[in-house]
Amino acid sequence: RLPSEAEWAWGARASGSELLKFPWGDAFPPPANSLENYADNTSAYVTGRVLGGYTDGHVVSAPVGSFKANQNRLLDMGGNVAEWVHDVYSIPSANGATEVDPLGGQSGDNYVIRGASWSHSKIAELRLSYRDYGQAGRDDVGFRLARYAE
């Protein structure tokens, strides 16, 4: 099964009792040794925009496991390809309240896509809270499988 959006967000952002802003911490831009796959100098001719001064060595997606795991031992949560999750896309609440284990929209035409990919370089796109939506596949979107704990 695909993870829910809440499961994906926990796996990407949870670091003890803290929620990370970016895979590397709270400061921007990423350090040179961040080792996540974003729109860097090597992909400039493909993406048209890059994260200046950053090079991860991959023009587009990298093989899984090319970069070290995050604090929860999960690979590629902050870059490489963005990921489909199970939830139907709905616009977040305007009051800014944090939802606890939200179930997402009950119906709709678009599904949630979480995380940054090799084609992203803007500060908002690199945040672990970044979310997108879509119906059709893209060359910078993939998926991961989740299973129920026994």
Model-derived features with residue positions:
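Functional-site microenvironments in short loops/helix caps that host divalent-cation chemistry
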Residues: 1-128, 135
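Short, structured beta-strand segments at or near domain termini in extracellular proteins/domains
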Residues: 139-150
